[in-house]
Structures are given as structure tokens and as C-alpha cells.
Amino acid sequence: SLTINNAKKIQTQPSYFDSFVGYWKPQVYPTDVELYQDRVEWFTNNHLDATKISDYNNFGVSTDVTDDDAISVIIKDKKINKINTAIAGNKLVVFTDSGNFIHNNDTFTPNSATFLKQGSTGGANVKPVIVRDNIIYVHPMKQAISGYAYNFETDGYAGQDITILANHLFENKKIKELAYQQEPYSIIWVLQEEGTVLACTYLRQQQVIAWTPMDFGGKVISIGVLSDGSNQELYLAVQRKNGTFVEKMPTRLPVADPKDRFFVDCGRTY
């Protein structure tokens, strides 16, 4: 549940924040939520509503607007598109069906909450992941993935399709979830809607992008990466004939005995 604190209301719009929860109805629930510059941001249709700084239940605005007041922004484009997802890193990036929009100021205040369109690919309602300085996001049709990063040559953000060399793995299939395993091998895990999983070894600085289909012997319905303190591990919810199970993929770490290093598709020991 969400409690709205309206201790300080804006005089010119006295009912706006009173009805804030009211327009979160079944057809217009927030599509995503993020934490950026110590504010919680909620995304509904083409609106972004952000709380006051360090006061995550407070959408109040004072009579004389101050830098820590709540923020309400409409993401503007040639046509109205609802916000499908967003992700916060050094900048807040918002994805609609027709564009990628980035907060283009150093501070996020009521007077500096402007967004610049930096790309027309758009993004689906699949949560992106951050791989070092790169945002990995799914295209609107959910059949391709791009990496989104700052380009010094163009002085702007640009996307690169990282699935173009493995199109056969995405034909007639839609992407459901992404997960990123930073250690030990920098792998992006991709779950497709029919339950198949792909692994992408991704090292942008070395220009390494390598895709591999994974067979887990069942239908995977969700994926996630968790840390155990020493390594990051992939967890999967897998539907099998005798039920649904949460499973963990073993980590491929170096071992002392060469016989235990046998990780190949086809091989022979002699």
C-alpha cells in the first residue's frame, strides 16, 4: 500500500495530489518504478511522478516550489506513447514504443526535469539491465535487444543491436525477462516467453558478443541473479513433469583436477 503525505499542497492545483492514487485504476496502474537521485519515480501512461527527496511516500508540493519538492512530468513526443519501462543509472532513461528519452540535466528537480529524445528504437515492457556503462534493453516487438550507451563521437546516447548476429535464436519468439550475471563471466541471461533461455557473453570494451541457447530440460518461467557473497549465481523457476522448482545453475569455476574441467558440447577423454 502507498500512503500519500500532502502536508504541503500546491495552491494552484489543490486537488491534484489528493487524487493521485485515484487515477491508478486497473487500466492505468504504474508500468514501472525506479529510484533516481533519492526520489521514487512512478511511471503511468506518459507521466512520470516523483516523490520528494528522501521522503518516498510524499508527493507534496509547496506554494513556492523548492528543489526538493515532488515532480510531475509528461514525456512528450510527436505521438502519445505510454512509458513501457525505465532504468536509473548515472542518468534516468525512459522507454516508450517509439523512443528512448534521457534526463539531460545533472540534477533532478521540478525546474530541471527535462527529457531529451535520444533514439527512436523504443523499448518493451521488459526491465532493462545495466552492464557496466551500458543499458541493455528489449525492442518493442520483444524480438531484439540493444545496448544503449554514451557515444563520444556523436556527443549523445546511441543503441547497438546485439542480437543481429544471432537472429535465428529470436525468430518468432518473444523475450520475457533479462538478468545480468556480472561475475565471473559477464553473462546476460534472456528468458523467452515459451520457456527457453539464451546466454550472451557480453564484453563491450573487447567487442565480444557471443550467444548460446541453453537446454534445462523443462519450461523456464522466470530467471534472476543473486549473490552468495563470493559469486553471482543464476536462479531459475522451472516447470517439470512433477512440478515447478526453483533451481540454481552451478558456477563454472576453475578446479584443481583437469578431469573436472570437461565443459564442452562434445568431447572425448583418453
PLM feature segments, named:
Residues 83, 97-98:
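Short glycine-rich loop/turn motifs
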Residues 31, 84-85, 91-93:
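Parallel beta-helix/beta-solenoid repeats that form elongated, surface-exposed shafts/blades used
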Residues 62-77, 89-92:
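Core mixed alpha/beta domains of very large multi-subunit molecular machines
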Residues 1-27:
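Small/polar beta-strand repeat architecture
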Residues 24-28, 78-81, 90, 110-115, ...:
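Beta-sheet repeat architectures centered on beta-propellers
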Residues 27-69, 98, 104, 111-148:
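Carboxylate/His-rich catalytic cores and anion/metal-binding grooves
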Residues 101-102, 198:
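WD40 beta-propeller blade core
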